Amino acid sequence: LLDSPATGQDKRLPLNGILDRANLAGREAGSAHAEVVEFLSQPGAYPGHPADVQIIESHMSLVFLADDLVYKLKRPIKLDFVDFTAIESRRVSCEREFEINQQLAPGVYLRTLPIVRNSAGSLTLGGEGEVIDWLVVMRRLDSAQALDAQIERGEVRPPDIKQVCEVLARFYLGQTSLDVDPDVMLGRWEEGVRLIENALTDPAFSLPSELIDPPLVSLRRFLANESDLLAARVELGRILEGHGDLKPEHIHLGPPILLIDRLEFDERLRWCDPFDEVTFLGIECARLGAPWIAPQLESGMARLLGERPPEVLLEFYRCYRACLRARLSIEHLRDESPRTPSRWPRQARAYLRLAGESLKNGDQTNGNSSLTGSP
């Protein structure tokens, strides 16, 4: 994992704030989690007793940076799409995360490790005793080499994106097509649009209709009139298990290029058309200030995979992904104790503007779009 937090995470938060959230409402699971967090925040918990332990908090995990290693702890949470309240579910998730990241991030994910209460009642990393939680142990990477950091510094160049495309193409070409019912996939898209619409139009969030309406109308129109294009991708065998969370902060330009944090907790969330996943990455790069990356990703993947979907389908993918990110951003405000609450409406509006741009620009390869151009 990188040695500083990815976009969307809070950097080195005060321990008391993290413990307050871990202990929320005095729940037993929260109390046990708070004990583990306090233990892992101490340098004495780790081999070699590092001088300092830095903590990064995300929605689903806590990451502890200790010298050249990273220790990732799943939070005992229950959401619509995942339930980590049981120790066994966290163990399974840790083991799965270790396994599925070997291909795209070799040498980064080192092992899983139990947190144990020994006979004296003390917590230790490994050893004999009662297992009370699990960690994924990773090699610490240089955050300066992450794609998001390089975008921020203005250092990303077309050859970098070409190499990312080559890594992705090798990965996709090595995957087996999934035997999925087209109606199942269409149902997922329809449900996704329904959830997006419900969230973005919730009066509690006060998102402006001029940002919401055009992309929602476009998404509904596509599903009503062009859904056969989605079914065709299934029938052509283009649906496979992708990365599942292909964000710029998860791409380490190296060398070598490493793609970390492949989504582990639900394989169905990795089911995708490679071009859908790549448009997601392009949208994220555009939000960070590098809109030229999106068309290069799409054209590079088309060249390497030997095909390019119809432009109307790519436009749907772009619009859907931007709207989905807007939905996930604004729904942070539904959390019992949302972190940085002022941030999420701003971020949702930024994604909605990108969704609108994807519609206004049509073919993004024509050189007239704000999503094209070169650095």
Language-model regions, residue ranges each:
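Intrinsic-disorder-associated interaction segments
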Residues: 8, 26-33, 189, 212, ...
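The feature marks either
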Residues: 1
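P-loop (Walker A) phosphate-binding loop of NTP-binding proteins
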Residues: 374
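ATP/Mg2+ or Mg2+-diphosphate-binding catalytic cores
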Residues: 327-371
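Conserved ATP-binding subdomain of kinase catalytic cores across diverse folds
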Residues: 34-235, 239-243, 248-324
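Non-catalytic regulatory/interaction regions at protein termini and inter-domain linkers
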Residues: 12-49
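Intrinsic disorder/low-complexity segments enriched in polar/small residues
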Residues: 10-12, 198, 285, 361, ...
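Short, low-complexity intrinsically disordered segments enriched in A/P/G/S/L with frequent Arg
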Residues: 4-5, 11-13
